[in-house]
Amino acid sequence: MSLDLINIIFGMKVRQARLEAGLTLTDLARQAEMSPSYLTEIEKGRKYPRADKIVKMAEALGKPYDDLVSIRLAPSLRQLETTLSSTTMQRFPFEEFGLEPADVLGLITREPERASALLHAVVEIARRYDLREEEFLRAALRSYQEMHENYFPDLEDAALRFSAEFGPRYGFDETMLPTLDALSTLLRQEYDYTIDDRALANIEELRAFRSLVLPGRRPQLFINSRLYARQVKFILAREIGYRYLSLKERSLTSTPDRVDSFQQLLNDARAAYFGGALLMPRGRVLADLQAFFALPAWEPGRFSAMLTTYGVTPEMLLYRFSELIPEFFGIKLHILRFHHTAGSDEYHLVRHLNMNQLLVPSGIGLLEHHCRRWLSIRLLPDAPGAAADPLPVGVQLSEFLSTQEQFLCMGFGRRMVLSPQVASSVIIGFRVDADLRATVRFLDDPNIPRDIIHETCERCPLTPEQCTVRAAPPALLEARREQMARKLALSQLQARYGTGD
């Protein structure tokens, strides 16, 4: 058991005993001959007092010394102990959200038995859906990004400083974008990298990785030769980000086999952000977005042309949009990325960033079928190969059946380079409100397809005649209707015969 957990359990016991004894912090501090501020630190699990102080605290609280220092909790609180000692709790990035474990503890100790029952339920749900610690940490990262609206000025400034420092030597600035050759030469000359673009593709077990790094005095960067130039550019720019930002704790492969900490995920995200800002400079992207939003009619060619302008993939472009649009245009947005394997009827949400409270059923282990009318889903069956140029663009004005909320969505679908049997779609969506109408002139273009959508087929009330792409019967909707019918029948029975009093 870690020292921190011992502190936390001791602090929880002291606080509970003090409340049971009806003592204020000042009362107990005076009787135990310590300052109220020091007692506060003890109750929050930050400090552990000397034995003589514990003796005085035990006397003031009317508790045996051994009971107070024991790390055993009451049976009803055992789940609390298990949760507090879990690696997820120990490694959760509370500080990134302005919290400490003790702050959470303060909430728990107000109703410890109820909190223990709740945590037990959460643990059981996690077991039911086989949730891994990595998924909790990724959810924490997503929340952290959404909390900051995915805009980080320090990383924007770092990318600008880097361009000003190294751009003149390697032929790029905010108007001249960095080339693949410039980035690879920079990595070799400034950071002493060796770059290999043959080995990965020739090793069967490693062919699925886009890149792999072997750190050392002279780092080795392995890049899969099957990737396209725009993908390689991002790998190089991200690798520069790790070095320029001095990010030590990081993933060594493009898709990490294991996640050891939140800091690893955060550093990966910071390096990727830097890489995107380097390839797509803020000022230039904002000017292009301003011109695009000012178009009087929807022009898919202008949208897809930005892929060529910046030499990036759809995911890179739309993710860069998500970093700049909320901050500089005041528009809330979401990004969804789905995968679909040929021959399968399953669609998997593999990445999302949700800054406009979109109703996205995204739980791990979701046994429902996403609405087939979503643009994200519609782009997948006919997705072209990744080499298609230009990639076809999808656009849709979607209206939720249940809330009448509207979202303008646009994006791309294509097949994965390293897994051609997998189709991937990525879309960016904007909530239709006064801010969007004031910004996007082509919003009401009649050439933009419109459709009614829902969350999942299992929740949708549309009849087969109203929806021809339903993938599953409305089982959850019918179950809810049956429950409401039973509730109504029970109320009618009570009204007719009384409650029996």
Where are these regions (language model features)?
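Short juxta-domain linker segments that transition from a proline/glycine-rich
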Residues: 2-9, 16-20, 26, 30, ...
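Active-site signature of alpha/beta-hydrolase-fold catalytic machinery across serine-
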Residues: 41
